[in-house]
Amino acid sequence: MDTNLFNPAKRNRSDKNIRLTYVGRVAIEKNIKEFLNVKGDYKKTVVGDGPELKKYTNKYPEIEFVGLKMGEELAKYYADADVFVFPSKTDTLGNVILESLASGTPVAAYPVTGPKDILTESRINTLDNSLEISIQKALKVKREDCRYFALQLTWEGCTEQYLSLSLIHI
């Protein structure tokens, strides 16, 4: 992941709404309907395209559907979110989780393969069988903890960890 692109410095919001964001294909297999049906006083944004986009745009007019975004524009959506919601129960690895963490945005997700393999540190682990409870946990996570964790997962971060472990054993 590009930690220069996905960076908390891109955050530029003045509103006080709690913003939940989903990034990915708008498709049934992504379990996005669980995100769309989350109860609470949230502003929800869906970033992405897919076969269910038109249907969900019509069914959920209160939700902001912005379509496919890339590069700087995508990075801004991650940084501006208060919580990134990853509702999938079938993805094995979500790059979007890493991009969100690099942006300093905590992740709400189910405790399934993928999220549970990435969100291993207790300070950022918000996993729960209830997406709504996971969101509440994520709202308590410090953004700097997300960023710090993501920096450990870059090639540079992994190399530093490897070298520090190697030096211990010399």
Regions found by a protein language model. Name each.
Residues 89:
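Aromatic "clamp/platform" in nucleotide-sugar-dependent glycosyltransferases that forms part
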Residues 106-109:
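Short hydrophobic beta-strand element within catalytic cores of glycosyltransferases
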Residues 76-81, 162:
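Short alpha-helical donor nucleotide-sugar binding micro-motif in glycosyltransferases
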Residues 13-30, 36-47:
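Conserved donor-binding/catalytic core segment of Leloir-type glycosyltransferases
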Residues 168-170:
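Conserved small/polar residues in nucleotide/adenosyl-binding loops
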Residues 1-17, 55:
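Acidic anion/phosphate-binding donor-loop and adjacent secondary structure
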Residues 54-72:
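Nucleotide-activated donor-binding/catalytic signature segment of Leloir-type glycosyltransferases, i.e.
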